[in-house]
Amino acid sequence: MLLVVNIGESQLADAEAIEREFASKHAGPGVAVVALCAKIEAELATMEPADALEFRRDLGLPEASPLDRAIREAYALLDLQSFLTAGDDECRAWTVRRGSSAPEAAGKIHSDLEKGFIRAEVARWDELVEAGSLAELKKRGRLHVEGKTYIVQDGDVVNILFNL
């Protein structure tokens, strides 16, 4: 169970204590608590990332958004993870159950990819960001080839090779 506690601006300094209080009252396996001020989070969502970060700092808030934390907690509670596909002009995240094989992950993109799965070229997201492109990763030998038994990891960047 994910408890998202909406607090007022005047309670922001006490967010961690509020989370601990709710966690102690509702303790148990599969319970997570995140306190956030929905009013401020809505305002931050309309800002450019750099402006939002500066606003968070001005308010004395942690740099990490509690909304992002709520999403991570929800994924964990539901046993989900994300993998990514990246092209020249687009990067997209896909959600799969933790423990999904490469063909199962391919099927989340399109059923034909699962049916005709041959192999996957896989890299870590942080390595892709550092390299700047999949082509550069391949050139550096950092793109590894995986077969049908590969278990997709959270944050993998996957290029599916298939044939129908």
Regions from the language model: what does each represent?
Residues 1-153, 158-164:
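C-terminal-of-GTPase-core extension/linker across diverse P-loop GTPases
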